[in-house]
Amino acid sequence: MTEEKKVVRKKLKSAGDIGKYMADYYVELDEASKKGEPKIAWCTSVGPAEILRALGFLVYFPETHSAMLGATRMATDLIPVANAMGYSPDICSYLTADIGAFVKGVTPLSKAFGIQSIPKPDVLAFNTNQCRDVQDWFNWYGEKFNAPVCGVHTYRGVGDVTEAHITGIAKQMQALVEPLEKVAGRRLDMTEFKRVVALSRECSELWKKVLDTASAMPSPITFFDGTTLMGPAVVGRGTQEAVDVYKLLLAELRERIANGEGAVESERFRIYWEGMPVWGRLSAHSQLFASLQANVLASTYCNSWIFSDLDPEDPFNSMARAYTKLFIVRSDAAKEKYIKDMLAFFKVDGIVYHDAKTCPNNSNCRYGMPQRLENETGIPSLTINGDLNDLRLLSDEQTKTNVEAFIEQLEERRG
């Protein structure tokens, strides 16, 4: 297991189309920010994007910027800047990296797209379905830009999603409309709102089909592919362009399946990733698992942008239902049932949990879940200690040693 093996990673042609989509997205925001029109709304990644788009806003998602800070390995040097301002090193490193970057006047958008700064918001809209940190994050920028901040406060630890849950969230979403209309300078057109929700649903369905191709043996896609291909599902839901680019991706993946072509050469082990990616180690982790003929092919994280409950004929209630059924909002019992279904569907041999130091809401290995799931399914697991953005919290050598030992364990189980 310790012998190094050269790995040839198979790139998807349509990844280039998605890269162009993301470049166009950021350039459009930059131009609007400079001109002052169209107006720009900031939104959390699972926030009320459909309402914002229907009101004519361009929508910027700061979490994607933070992921870029992590992937470019800029974040580790920027987090201490926010820590010095009073933000604890234990809170979300998306927040601390992003605020640190703003204070220092740097952004990965400069090298990637020639863009000098993040876009100026006219309004910021959050949903705390991910965590409370997003509210603090947006409030900080609201003060800096003198822009209004509004949001939805979601229930936590939800078991069965009830009509009471849905009604409560739908009312909060409806209450956003009036203040957002004032900023937009226009009324919410319900026909346009329904059109946007329909496109968001179509994008979501295509993204699900993309991720579901990993159930094929061998899988035509990896989790690490998914973390970069998910861009349009996050920033582009509600747009035709996101739908179009995912149709191209899905066709390419289906062609791989038809040809028996796997993303990992000679795939032997199928791994489920539970938790956040380590953005600054995507390539290293992809190479590590592939060198062991292991494909990390499915995850809870990438599935977080599948919203099958969206219904253009009932936009507010269906948005409330979709965004409350989100995995991160649910109880441990609901999460465990979900993961068990995923393990069966993707024919998984082992689970890797990422215990992200600054993201407790996405670290589901702290209260006995790995042990309970292994007892129920017989599928072994490994926990990796690290973080989504702060590489000081990760030991590369320890991760490598533990992963190699885990794959050896899976090998021994096969006899």
Question: What positions do the PLM features span?
Answer:
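An N-terminal, globular interaction/scaffold subdomain
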Residues: 42-117, 137-138
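Internal, well-ordered alpha/beta segment that forms a basic, Gly-enriched binding/recognition surface
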Residues: 101-213
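Redox- and metal-dependent alpha/beta enzyme cores, enriched for Fe-S-associated oxidoreductases
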Residues: 53-83, 272-340
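TerminUS-proximal long segments
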Residues: 336-344, 348-350, 354-415
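A charged, amphipathic alpha-helical module
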Residues: 2-39, 170, 174-296, 300-301
